[in-house]
Amino acid sequence: MKSLNIIFAGTPDFAAQHLQAILNSQHNVIAVYTQSDKPAGRGKKLQASPVKQLAEQNNIPVYQPKSLRKEEAQSELKALNADVMVVVAYGLILPKAVLDAPRLGCLNVHGSILPRWRGAAPIQRSIWAGDVQTGVTIMQMDEGLDTGDMLHKVYCDILPTETSTSLYNKLAELAPSVLIDVLDNLENSKFIAEKQDGSQSNYAEKLSKEEAQLDWSLPAMQLERNIRAFNPWPIAYFSTEDKDGNAQTLKVYQAEVLPHQDKPAGTILSADKNGIQIATVDGVLNLLQLQPAGKKPMSAQDLLNGRAEWFTIGKVLA
């Protein structure tokens, strides 16, 4: 089993966990590519990415080009003479010159079973769509968006209560060992590259704050999935009015689907210790954990203790 000289490209904590796994393996990380330091916190001080922090702790050279399209950046990368480049949530597009620079090309760790969800938000979209299974795909990168040949896939279940946070953590635990298995066997025939069937693919579009607004004209089951998919960001929300007619926005962290009823969508059916029940187009969404502006998330009962007038029975929410 040959030790590989690896360029690692990644930015968030999810990527840092993969970098740590490679550092713990027999392979050598000769350089790290990550996005530019970003302002963070109240003071808006520049903060290094988790990947950069880990690289610096291990005395690995760090490169932070704003783009890899320029010839200078491409020449710099090629001069590293890497065996392979591993890309995990890097955030920059890799042009063909970069894809071709390492001897064995570029590998990507993708947070779904391809080709089901290509694009930026595969973890969130798998919950949003009601998938019962997802996993991790290690892919040989090409110029397309997550269209490369698949080297290895490992599956995991999506539980009925799964949020994007919990599924992210599950995949972050699963994926690094899958990556190391591929790297260990990259130059033998253990993993045979498999072409993707593009007709089976969907685009996992980024989430937006606009999409997170609960639309009571949607099915209750879809709204419940939205609440789980949009946690930890952007968090599903809706608005009601207080006794003075002022709009009050509430974020929703947990809900359940109850049987069908015949009231117009958006009607508040009940509000008590068991939850705040709101009619949807085909059923009832029972809101269990909510967060008013400026407060921490709380149970429906705790919310109603001080704000029951926000949820008058029969009121129709927009």
Curated annotation (Swiss-Prot):
GO terms for cellular component: cytosol. CDD domains: FMT_core_Met-tRNA-FMT_N (cd08646), Met_tRNA_FMT_C (cd08704). The keyword Nucleus does not apply. Its EC number is 2.1.2.9. The keyword Cytoplasm does not apply. (6S)-5,6,7,8-tetrahydrofolate binds at residues 112-115. It holds the Pfam family Formyl_trans_C. SUPFAM superfamilies: FMT C-terminal domain-like (SSF50486), Formyltransferase (SSF53328). HAMAP family: Formyl_trans. This is Methionyl-tRNA formyltransferase.
